């Protein structure tokens, strides 16, 4: 909004949307895990603006989890928000996207490869990256953009659950600016901060025989 865009915001709580105090923003409360709720928000948006230019899926959940405390119900909830919700959004808005517009999925570098404590979080983010890649192959020839954002650590209520030092930690504002700047490049993947994500990309290239022992050593696990 600060750069002149007309913005619509969605979340389950309209009070949280109002608390953002973004001037002239259209508030569309909805639940990303509920198809009917997304359809209602879409109808309200089209009634107000007659079209959709760019959609960003930022909904996310995170619970640190390892095999010793694996909880299927919790893991399914996390995946439902992080991945299934993104598919629901895509199904809702794809008919409205036109050349010059597009859709952005916020995933994570945790989706590159398996990591300690990411038993519930990582798989959904990996699936989201794959989903975005498939959509890009289909939609790019039509002039419709698809982007995936893979941040490192961002200081939020979710990452506050971590009991370890988070390298290259960004504020939400810094992450938002990096995302907007990344969209200007036209590149499919937007990843930041580079000093951290480049390390993660290097690790992702390693064969398992090197990757597993190195990650255990780096994480103390």
Question: What feature does the model see in each segment?
Answer:
Residues 5-18:
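Conserved glycine-rich Rossmann-like NAD(P)H-binding loop of the short-chain dehydrogenase/reductase
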Residues 148, 164-199:
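C-terminal helical subdomain
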Residues 66-67, 74-77:
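Substrate-binding pocket helix/loop in short-chain dehydrogenase/reductase
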Residues 108:
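Residue(s) in the substrate-gating loop at a strand-loop-helix junction
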Residues 58-63:
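Conserved NAD(P)H cofactor-binding loop of Rossmann-fold oxidoreductase domains
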Residues 90, 124:
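Active-site helix of classical SDR
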Residues 21-36:
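Rossmann-fold cofactor-recognition segment
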């Amino acid at each position: 909004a600060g750069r002149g865009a007309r913005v619509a915001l969605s979340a389950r709580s309209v009070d949280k949307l109002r608390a953002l105090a973004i001037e002239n923003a259209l508030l569309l409360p909805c639940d990303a895990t509920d198809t009917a709720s997304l359809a209602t928000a879409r109808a309200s948006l089209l009634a107000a603006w007659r079209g959709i230019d760019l959609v960003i899926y930022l909904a996310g959940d995170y619970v640190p989890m390892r095999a010793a405390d694996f909880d299927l119900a919790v893991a399914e909830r996390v995946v439902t928000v992080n991945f299934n919700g993104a598919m629901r959004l895509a199904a809702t808005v794809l008919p409205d996207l036109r050349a010059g517009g597009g859709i952005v999925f916020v995933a994570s570098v945790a989706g590159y490869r398996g990591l300690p404590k990411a038993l519930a979080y990582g798989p959904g983010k990996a699936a989201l990256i794959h989903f975005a890649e498939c959509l890009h192959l289909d939609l790019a020839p039509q002039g419709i953009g698809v982007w995936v954002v893979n941040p490192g650590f961002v200081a939020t209520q979710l990452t506050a659950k971590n009991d370890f030092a988070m390298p290259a930690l960004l504020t939400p504002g810094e992450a938002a600016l990096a995302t907007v700047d990344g969209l200007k490049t036209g590149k499919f993947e937007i990843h930041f901060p580079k000093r951290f994500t480049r390390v993660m990309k290097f690790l992702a290239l390693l064969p398992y025989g090197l990757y597993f022992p190195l990650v255990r050593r780096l994480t103390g696990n």
